[in-house]
Each structure stands twice: as C-alpha cells, then as structure tokens.
Amino acid sequence: MAKILVADDAPAVLDVLDDVLTMEGHEVIRATTGGEAVRKFQESRPQLAVLDIIMPDMDGLLVLDAIRRVDSDLPVILITGLVGESLGKKVERYQGVAFFEKGSGLDRFVDLVNKTLGMPGKPGP
C-alpha cells in the first residue's frame, strides 16, 4: 500500500482520516500545520499528499506550491469544508489535483484516494 501525508489542523479530522487510511493498509504521516507538512514531505517522500486548504502558518495551496517545486508529479488531494466560486478560481490553476469536500463521506474519500493512487476501488453493494 501507499505512504500518505495527511495535513489538517483539526485533530478530529486528522484522526478520522488517519484511521480510515490505516484500515485500508496505508502508512499515514500526519501534520497539523503547513510548515510541518512541507517538512514531513521532504523527510518521508510520500506517494500521495492529502492537504487541508485552510491551516495555520501556511495554507494547503502554499504547501502544494512547495511540494510541486520538489515533485511536480506527486498526486495531491485538497480537502476543505469551504466550497464556492472563489475557491474554485484559486485552485483551477493546479493540474492533477483532486478535491474532497469534508463531510462528503468516508467511502467517497477512500474511493478518491484509491483512484488518485491508481488503485482499484472497492466493489459496490
């Protein structure tokens, strides 16, 4: 399975994402700030980064910029509780980035992770 960097400043969200990804067999590297996410990316070289857009000290888009300077091909999923036209305009310049709206369901999140990693999804009911 994959090594996945998950960055979110909300401990409850980070715990849930860590739990679900670990249950899927992935190794999770956790970060609670943007700066920590960049540092842990450099140390661990994950196969996927899951980044909250709004974090203290450095938002997910700045983290994405820092990651892209080192690895322009790393798959990235941006997660947010905010949706709207202004957010869409901010992120439309990023190629190869998936988006996940918090609260959309963990099954949907796992499917997006698998799709982004190029792994088969779970069969439906």
Annotate each language-model stretch with its function.
Residues M55:
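Receiver (REC) domain active-site loop signature in two-component systems and cognate sites
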Residues Q42-S44, A66-L74, Y94:
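Conserved phosphotransfer cores of two-component systems
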Residues A7-D8, A31, A49:
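Conserved sequence signature across two-component system core domains
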Residues S44-V50:
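Active-site beta3 strand of CheY-like receiver
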Residues T33-E36, D59-L62:
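Acidic catalytic/metal-coordinating carboxylates
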Residues L62, V83-D111:
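Alpha4 helix (beta4-alpha4-beta5 surface) of REC/receiver domains from two-component response regulators
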Residues P11-I29:
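Two-component/phosphorelay signaling modules centered on CheY-like receiver
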